[in-house]
From Swiss-Prot:
Its main location: cytoplasm. It comes from Bacillus thuringiensis (strain Al Hakam). This is tRNA-2-methylthio-N(6)-dimethylallyladenosine synthase. GO terms for cellular component: cytosol. Belongs to the methylthiotransferase family. MiaB subfamily. Binds 2 [4Fe-4S] clusters. One cluster is coordinated with 3 cysteines and an exchangeable S-adenosyl-L-methionine. SUPFAM superfamilies: Radical SAM enzymes. [4Fe-4S] cluster 2 binds at C221, C225, C228. It is found in: Cytoplasm.
Amino acid sequence: MNEQQRLASQQVNSSTKKEEKDYSKYFESVYQPPSLKDAKKRGKEEVKIERDFGLPEEFRNFGTGRKFYIRTYGCQMNEHDTEVMAGIFTALGYEPTFSTEDADVVLLNTCAIRENAENKVFGELGHLKSLKRRNPDLLIGVCGCMSQEESVVNKIMQKNQHVDMVFGTHNIHRLPYILKDAMFSKETVVEVWSKEGDVIENLPKVRRGDIKAWVNIMYGCDKFCTYCIVPYTRGKERSRRPEDIIQEIRHLAANGYKEITLLGQNVNAYGKDFEDIEYGLGDLMDELRKVDIARIRFTTSHPRDFDDHLIEVLGKGGNLVEHIHLPVQSGSTEMLKIMARKYSREHYLELVRKIKEAIPNAVLTTDIIVGFPNETDEQFEETMSLYREVGFDTAFTFIYSPREGTPAAKMKDNVPMEVKKERLQRLNALVNKLAIEKNDRYKGQIVEVLVDGESKNNPEVLAGYTRTNKLVNFVAPKSLIGQLVKVKVTDAKTWSLNGELVEEPIEVE
């Protein structure tokens, strides 16, 4: 996925001297591979907040005359990490390019959540091999979640020796030093921290747009669902301080941003790691209601941590939108237990009831895995019935993909692939059926739309999203891009709505 990149003016200093933690070993070696065994450990070391970072003198104009290209795979967190890396490149003097042919540095920011994502990365590395032959000075790097996996790093070292550098999710702020090492080293530079570092504030960012922004509020996950690699690749749960988050969002609002999405691997576990204050996501959202910005969203939430206080705050409305993404993964209590989700079908349905009671117009979406090891026909039917009972607007659906190093990867799987595909097909048919039924209800309604830009399919048509995250296409002047407008829905499709402009623009109170 290409990134639209703009100039940024700040930079991170990698001086990371610690009173209680010593990471000097990472700086002395250009080969520090990952360890899933170490990544699984959850120590009680204090997580510090580092705020005083600047560009060291040795890196001034380091990238002048050079260009960088970043290809991003996976979730919004990866997209946001790319914004940070683009900021670091820019502060070093590099310029962005949207072509690997023109680049002096190519980074692949990777996703490890499913095998298909990893296959795409290795396919791209194969394409880059010929480019490296034509341009031996080109630096090729692999970063992100795949880099945190031992098997991936071993495969890169053995079969992709044209890769110059590998680094992970915990040491993005070390990019200037990694670039320097890769530029002068004859060997592949591997600097992957198996244990997470501190929370680094004031990192530079080159945001993808000036209408919507992502803001990390926490990092990592401690849930250890049996199928999931994320707790290993992203480390333990670490929350940013609320004052830093609020300051960042106020700054974005002052610069004209209309919508903020709060990010975290398990966003509603926010604040559970604080030892000095009792402060959770509900408290943060309550404070963000007072910020002069049109919309606040968050993703991704875990049903286990979705508490009553958060529901109460979301029910107050205002700039807190009515869309909640609440991954269920399965409708079977037995499957949920094997997945180590730590909730039951009944608990999930009760949570949905509470949400709908507090927010009558709430739109719920979800994630579902089919074909988990030993899933029976009856257990799959429970997923189908739960989907109908909740009445989700849509879902991201997947066939289970084993991840090396996770408990589920060791489970015996007696579900044939043709059965898994048939179940996915049936589930998707239900998802599509309910999606069009839900969208049909919007016909004739007037909805608030934040205009993102031109439609991908027709430059003469504008496109934007409602508060409930419905895509709306309509004809209007391009001067309305970035504005909130009223649109009357005239037609409904499975994944989008068509409409006509009624009123422009809406003032945010």
